[in-house]
């Protein structure tokens, strides 16, 4: 049994749980809320978490941290569901699937509590009779929708309590025909309400019926010789038509439906919701998610379904999802049926147009997740480069960093490697391998001098760009020789540092005393990555060169092995596979190597052993 089960506090609390529905809160030793869940039967659900060798990875990880338990009993499972969503938003537990920045999601409000309602963006929902539409995934898309509404419908834009005690002068919106002027007292409440009802129809996605309604009103106004009002309806119809022409038709039979796509990578996820209203794709909403590493797809989608639709102003009768989440959404469906008067249908289409639409949502989710991860990585790398700039007092963040490492085996076959990072990421085209020419034996400082000289000379000859920082894998002696090479090449202005492996010590030119920076800082992590990549690249090159030299020494005295066959053998066994481990069959696979020659090579290998 996990140690946590022996804790008297939890054992005693479990005895008092009872079989009522409610929410349970697992807490850490420090009182942090780790996980929040709901249950139809609290006692049964909580005991399930305390099983030894639990099959769920996420639950096993939770077991290691739980220290205390709290719970809130409710009258029904539906009440538990609503409470669960509220508690998760309040505590944001790290073991729950979490939607990023949940508080930011905006709504469009139609202030029906006022005599002359306004239409505006808000994040606060009040229980005062106002009508809310959303949530939208970001402020930009909300503003675009609001802008369309304010261009189509002549509703007021100014925030003031109406009617005013004294009519004010008409504003520019009134002069342009974009407002009916309720602040002047020019329009009765009943007539203004008709326009507000049309706004609500538009936001509900009932554009077909809205177009029909406006067409009837335009004809009626024209028949009454009320040409001003008829012109207003005509203009509204034209603007709606222009808006609809920009929308994609995805369903010939019309209808309202939501299509949910989902993508995940490691601990991050992305949900895309496509809103189809009247058969037209109206809105794409994007919701980033965290904490999905050990969660099943059904759990993640179930959590999204709960958090989104419990707060959604409009719920369509049909919702397409990429996985079966009937069980995870049963309680939510009960609440929605009570709230809307109908139970939405969940479907996971396997073919046809609906499957194609679901694939579009999933593809958008993948693209959105990739874009977000890249943006996060770019922000992290930018922060790392900024930190390195501050660490070494550079003029600007080091956009190009190069690192050099020496590899040899007791001085034999010495090679050097140079790797390049651009904007904090490996730039493979800038990687370089060097066979040391001027030194034999163990002389790392001299070899560094040679490599830096060759590199800087090549940059000068090619009129290429100098790096913003050079990192030498080594201590003060290697760094001093690198600086000497830079001085000789007239490139002494290039900043250089040494990074020693033992304690991740940083050396500056002319200073034998190391500096120790925070090992866990983003700047040091990037420098270690750079140094380790240079070491990996160098070791790989050195191993390859040693293998070739070993093969040369093995085959150079074999009779009948000329230059051409030697090259073929070297090329064939140039990787991890060494010639001394070769079988006769493997030797025969080399072009130009027959039975007799293979036997001679094997005899030479055995003689060496």
From Swiss-Prot:
The UvrABC repair system catalyzes the recognition and processing of DNA lesions. UvrC both incises the 5' and 3' sides of the lesion. The N-terminal half is responsible for the 3' incision and the C-terminal half is responsible for the 5' incision. GO terms for cellular component: cytoplasm; excinuclease repair complex. SMART domains: GIYc (SM00465), HhH1 (SM00278). Residues 208-243 form the UVR domain. It is found in: Cytoplasm. The keyword Cytoplasm applies. One of its GO terms (biological process) is SOS response. One of its GO terms (molecular function) is DNA binding. It comes from Leptospira borgpetersenii serovar Hardjo-bovis (strain JB197). Belongs to the UvrC family. This is UvrABC system protein C. Interacts with UvrB in an incision complex. Gene3D superfamilies: 5' to 3' exonuclease, C-terminal subdomain, GIY-YIG endonuclease, UvrC, RNAse H endonuclease domain. Its main location: cytoplasm. The keyword Cytoplasm applies. Keywords: Cytoplasm, DNA damage, DNA excision, DNA repair, Excision nuclease, SOS response. Residues 19-97 form the GIY-YIG domain.
